Amino acid sequence: MKFLEKLKQAGNRNKSLLCVGLDPDPKLMPVGMSALEFNREIIEATAPFVCGYKINLAFYEALGKQGWEILSETCEFIPRELITIADAKRGDIGNTSKAYARAILDELDCDGVTVSPYLGYDSLEPFIEYQDKGIFILCLTSNQGSTDFQMLKTEYLGQKRFLYEVVADKASLWNRYENIGLVVGATQQEELKKLRLIYPKLPFLIPGIGAQGGDLKATIENGTNPNGELAIICASRGILYARSGSEFAQGAAEAAEQMRDAINHYRKRF
């Protein structure tokens, strides 16, 4: 099944654009609980309210030799009708990029992955060739340092353009399999609105809601397409750690349901 088709089915099934980030932090998890058990309980509690899960690979790499096993088992535990996106931000050349793509899209069998465009098309091609997978290119990120490079102006097709605009245009040109999307932070509302108007058919993976200060209402208004779709709204800490101790899973379920419902409230205009 093509990524966009699966995304639409998952969104319709749970009436949700919400994507929960599975970022297990030992400092915030219940004392004595393994990352795998934490993830399982979070998934069981939140699955009715989401379109999918975004798995930040760094949190698993930080767990050492057991991290890959936990990552793999976490991916297997996610219901197959929901999407799984590996937040890997990979970008390299030649066989290295091919190996990254195999690891994430074959071995883990994730539905999507985030990639960095800094090394150019040949670094992304091994991912893009997985025609049924969603390839999300970092375009305009939610962190403060994003302006260091992404907001620089450069000559492009005879005009001065911001670098993030060049990335978005290249992504659109490379989208021959209709499997490419953009990562655009919820902290960049003016630019988010501009990008959505120019690229109504591209899915946007939108981090930055909650702890990073992104406004949910503005994100829905600016980030969805004319049908109120094609925006994947990411939230991690505000859901995973909504409550502490033994009630963490119930807290996550309530937080996910509340955010799902808030998103749908703002989607009513569509």
Swiss-Prot record:
Pfam families: OMPdecase. One of its GO terms (molecular function) is orotidine-5'-phosphate decarboxylase activity. The active site is at 89 (proton donor). GO terms for biological process: 'de novo' pyrimidine nucleobase biosynthetic process; 'de novo' UMP biosynthetic process. Its EC number is 4.1.1.23. SUPFAM superfamilies: Ribulose-phoshate binding barrel. It is an enzyme of class 4 (lyase). It catalyses: orotidine 5'-phosphate + H(+) = UMP + CO2. Keywords: Decarboxylase, Lyase, Pyrimidine biosynthesis. Gene3D superfamilies: Aldolase class I (3.20.20.70). Pathway: Pyrimidine metabolism; UMP biosynthesis via de novo pathway; UMP from orotate: step 2/2. Belongs to the OMP decarboxylase family. Type 2 subfamily. PANTHER family: OROTIDINE 5'-PHOSPHATE DECARBOXYLASE. HAMAP family: OMPdecase_type2. This is Orotidine 5'-phosphate decarboxylase.
